[in-house]
Amino acid sequence: MRLKNEIEYVFGILLYLTINGENRIISSNEISEKEEIPHLFSLRILKKLEKADLVIIFKGAKGGYKLKKDSSEITLKDAIESIEGDICIKDCLESPESCTLRKGNCGVHRVLKDIESQFISRLQDVNFRDLADGKY
């Protein structure tokens, strides 16, 4: 399993907004420049973050972006799911009938489900305030 570069950009944008956007609205140009993300790509990502209720878009000449909620409430899981949707290691974990081994009734299925649960739990434990504060 490999996270897309887009996810890395999401992490960068959310960290930048956490560190620099607490008391001000930040322009997409500033975010793109500081995080070294192509501007049009950052706009697409910011739109996805808005759709996921993680950022607010302020329109107009002095418009920009701000976190919608406190950064301590935004987790790595939220960030990944804003781009990827629900996290699922293997389709058969969500739909056992799609299991190619034993229709979801196998040791591999049970182990992967446990690994997926631990992975998601860990992603939920890490928030952007703690990341910005250097707790990891």
Name each region found by the language model.
Residues 42, 46-50:
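Basic amphipathic alpha-helical segments that dock to polyanions
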Residues 68-136:
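Non-DNA-binding regulatory cores of transcription-related proteins
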Residues 58:
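Conserved acidic, metal-coordinating active-site core of Asp-based
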Residues 61-68:
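Minor-groove-contacting beta-hairpin "wing" of winged helix-turn-helix DNA-binding domains
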Residues 5, 9-37:
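N-terminal helix-turn-helix DNA-binding core of bacterial DNA-binding proteins
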